[in-house]
């Protein structure tokens, strides 16, 4: 290795001066409130499902290993090294490594907290060669056939270099073969144990997908899943591909369905087409026929792994991301109720006492918080998905690349507010346990909770954009005492205007417009930073502790 190159590499590694000591590390860990995740499986699961549950958790643990490999090539070796260090510092490092599933702190802009690793998470994680540039990739895919170009930019491949140093495409089923064979075996065993036909079908097809790299049939089967054990396992979200947002990280959620809450909330799905037909966007961009099936599930989390359990915990998700499945069957919304309740109790309530005026604190509502998350997830399934750009059939995700996640998360938040306001205006939520003031006040308090995660991550950047937009419109005001309030005379029209702008960006695949908006609004302004400075000591999120093992 030539000395200049060696010096350049060494300067990229986290140095001892940058690495937190034991006290600092314990302070970082304390930002996550340990929370035991419990649900009654004794009375709600059959003997066969209880056997299946054990095998599903076994498969989920393998997903943890795959995801760590996806995040960084050196992760597994580092994890094993940390486990062998019995010192207090070593134990703290292992603890925080496990929270993040790697040596970079999600809450600190992916900065390293361990020595001897790159000072920041590689933007392309381990989906691409670490020395690959964006320009090299784009030039390379220009030389490929249409089929290979789709594979190179698809969810389920990694990009490697061949013996000559040329970029090449490797399917997940090859890259993670040994791990996926083990996970497929556990899924097959779970499928054999359960007596539920839809769970058996999904697990069997997902096991086959792990080895074939074709997830389409198993995604359709996941849409049809109707079982007490509500399982999500496989490669889904693309947040860790910060270069293009193409590559899916492996995740697992093993959940117990909440039958009572699912029945209560199912009526939302009956009004999705009506909401789509009235979105604040040009009529030509609306979808006249949404997918025929849009199931909603309210569940309690029993176990999560991989991309589903690192850093900030997911409170709900809307999948799959394959536009073919969304067009044919819609998408499924899964609400993790016990996770949401834990976040509300541990973070949102104490935050509200520091950023909201006293009278506004009385408007805080878990029902409003829970229902807006539901509306957020519903909103991922409406709006533009298949679009035309310069005569080409494409999607907002493909056109907006690495900007898509932040825009889509903001669109889901704001469309969720629009949806609930529409339903209130049309007397569709007459039995709701919250009112307009509670909805917008709780949304504002929740925004501060989300913004504490920083703006490096899609959700945080999208939330900063929302708050700054609403403040510029006068819909959110900063008080002299450092608290914030909603102007109820302006917030409805401001939300509608913002929703129009975000939906139009997606409908037109406007990368340049999205970049302008995010660069201008997706930042932490000084007035917001002052508010965050008052939140020290409040946990930022939860650290789930699973009763099911």
Where are these regions (language model features)?
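Structured alpha-helical bundle/scaffold domains in large eukaryotic membrane-trafficking regulators
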Residues: 75, 222, 456-459
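Short amphipathic alpha-helical segments that mediate assembly, nucleic-acid/protein binding
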Residues: 6, 134-137, 463
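Extended, compositionally biased alpha-helical segments that mediate assembly or anchoring
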Residues: 495, 499-549
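Bacterial N-terminal signal peptides
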Residues: 4-14
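N-terminal helix-rich structural modules
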Residues: 11, 18-202
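Fold-level signature of zinc-dependent metallopeptidase catalytic domains
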Residues: 25-55, 147-423, 427-429, 433-447, ...
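Long, well-structured alpha-helical subdomains associated
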Residues: 417-516
């Amino acid at each position: 290795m030539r000395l200049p190159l060696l010096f350049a590499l060494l300067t990229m590694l986290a140095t001892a001066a940058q690495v937190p000591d034991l006290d600092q590390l314990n302070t970082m860990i304390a930002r996550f409130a340990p929370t035991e995740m419990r649900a009654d499986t004794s009375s709600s699961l059959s003997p066969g499902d209880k056997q299946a549950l054990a095998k599903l958790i076994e498969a989920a643990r393998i997903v943890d290993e795959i995801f760590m490999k996806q995040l960084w090539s050196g992760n597994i070796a580092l994890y094993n090294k940390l486990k062998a260090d019995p010192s207090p510092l070593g134990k703290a490092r292992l603890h925080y490594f496990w929270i993040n599933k790697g040596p970079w702190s999600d809450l600190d802009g992916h900065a390293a907290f361990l020595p001897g690793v790159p000072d920041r998470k590689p933007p392309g994680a381990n989906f691409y060669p670490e020395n690959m540039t964006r320009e090299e990739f784009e030039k390379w895919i220009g030389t490929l056939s249409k089929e290979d170009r789709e594979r190179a930019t698809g969810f389920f491949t990694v990009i490697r270099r061949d013996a000559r140093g040329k970029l090449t495409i490797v399917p997940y089923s090859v890259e993670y073969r040994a791990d996926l064979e083990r996970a497929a075996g556990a899924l097959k065993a779970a499928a054999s144990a359960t007596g539920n036909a839809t769970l058996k079908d999904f697990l069997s097809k997902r096991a086959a997908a792990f080895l074939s790299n074709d997830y389409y049939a198993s995604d359709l089967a996941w849409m049809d899943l109707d079982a007490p054990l509500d399982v999500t396992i496989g490669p889904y979200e693309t947040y860790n591909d910060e270069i293009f947002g193409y590559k899916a990280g492996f995740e697992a959620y093993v959940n117990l369905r909440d039958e009572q809450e699912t029945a209560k909330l199912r009526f939302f799905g009956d009004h999705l087409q009506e909401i789509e037909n009235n979105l604040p966007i040009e009529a030509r961009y609306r979808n006249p026929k949404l997918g025929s099936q849009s199931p909603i599930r309210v569940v309690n989390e029993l176990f999560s792994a991989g991309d589903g359990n690192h850093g900030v915990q997911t409170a709900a998700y809307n999948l799959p991301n394959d536009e073919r499945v969304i067009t044919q069957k819609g998408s499924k919304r899964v609400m993790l109720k016990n996770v949401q309740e834990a976040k509300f109790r541990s973070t949102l309530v104490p935050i509200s006492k520091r950023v909201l005026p006293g009278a506004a604190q009385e408007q805080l509502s878990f029902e409003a918080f829970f229902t807006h998350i539901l509306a957020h997830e519903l909103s991922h399934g409406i709006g533009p998905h298949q679009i035309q750009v310069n005569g080409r059939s494409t999607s907002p995700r493909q056109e907006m690349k690495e900007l898509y996640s932040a825009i889509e998360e903001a669109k889901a938040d704001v469309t969720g507010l629009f949806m609930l306001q529409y339903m209130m205006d049309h007397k569709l939520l007459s039995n709701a346990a919250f009112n307009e003031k509670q909805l917008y006040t709780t949304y504002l308090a929740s925004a501060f909770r989300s913004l504490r995660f920083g703006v490096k991550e899609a959700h945080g950047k999208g939330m900063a954009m929302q708050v700054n937009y609403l403040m510029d419109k006068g819909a959110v005001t900063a008080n002299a005492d450092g608290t914030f309030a909603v102007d109820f005379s302006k917030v409805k029209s401001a939300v509608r205007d913002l929703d129009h702008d975000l939906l139009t960006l997606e409908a037109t695949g406007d990368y340049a417009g999205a970049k302008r908006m995010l660069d201008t609004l997706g930042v932490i302004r000084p007035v917001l930073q002052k508010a965050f400075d008052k939140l020290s000591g409040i946990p930022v999120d939860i650290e789930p502790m699973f009763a099911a093992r």
